[in-house]
Regions:
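Primarily recognizes the serine-hydrolase "nucleophile elbow" in alpha/beta-hydrolase
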Residues: 100-101, 107-151
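Gly/Ser-rich "nucleophile elbow"/oxyanion-hole loop immediately N-terminal to the catalytic nucleophile
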Residues: 24-30, 79-116
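A domain-start/cap signature at the N-terminus of enzymes
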Residues: 1-34, 112-119, 124, 136, ...
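Active-site machinery of serine-nucleophile hydrolases
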Residues: 34, 38-92
Length: 188
């Protein structure tokens, strides 16, 4: 089940409202994988009264319907009209906060997202590949010249060829680029 949480990044005033779902038998003294889910443009909001928009798709939707996961799930809400790529520094500070306050296994932090969040997955992964065990972008677009930064981690991209918002060739281009440079990327 999702709970509503919030965090203000010190020194920046950046407010992150987020949904949090903990494992069924959660033990604060344990150690858990962390999955961060970045939503698409349609789920942006104010981080408080509009936070449930984040649970329209993917992992947070299933958690809100009662599905339990063996990992900690964090789903932050991006402000209206914004893009994840503009908030990488703030997201890193937010991740530092999560690691400091939750029993996160730092070797098992996974980043996923769809559409705008899929693009955010590529961009945050390109900027900070050393922080993630793997990236799972869904219908996102990355920056082709940044694939070199993702060679050290597995990337599994998902994209449907009927997507009218972002053409599937964006994902094909990223996955092929990573593999052409010796990386470990898969496309579904």
């Amino acid at each position: 089940m999702n709970t509503h949480e919030s965090y203000v990044v010190p020194g920046t005033g950046m407010f992150w409202g987020y949904l949090q779902a903990l494992p069924k038998d959660y033990d604060p003294n344990g150690s858990y994988p962390l999955v961060i889910f970045l939503h698409g443009t349609g789920e942006c909001g104010n981080g408080t009264t509009e936070l449930d928009r984040v649970a329209i798709h993917g992992y947070p939707m299933h958690a809100s319907q009662g599905r339990e996961y063996p990992f900690i799930l964090i789903s932050p809400q991006l402000p209206e009209g914004k893009y994840w790529g503009a908030y990488i520094e703030s997201l890193n500070l937010f991740l530092d906060h999560l690691i400091a306050t939750l029993p996160v296994d730092e070797k098992r932090i996974y980043l996923t997202g769809l559409s705008n969040g899929g693009t955010g997955t590529y961009l945050w992964g390109q900027a900070n590949a050393d922080r993630f065990a793997a990236l799972l972008p869904v219908c996102g677009a990355g920056i082709a010249w940044g694939v070199r930064e993702m060679l050290s981690i597995p990337v599994w991209g998902f994209h449907g060829d009927c997507d009218e918002a972002l053409h599937y060739t964006e994902t094909v281009r990223m996955i092929e680029g990573i593999n052409a440079m010796g990386g470990n990327a898969k496309l579904t």
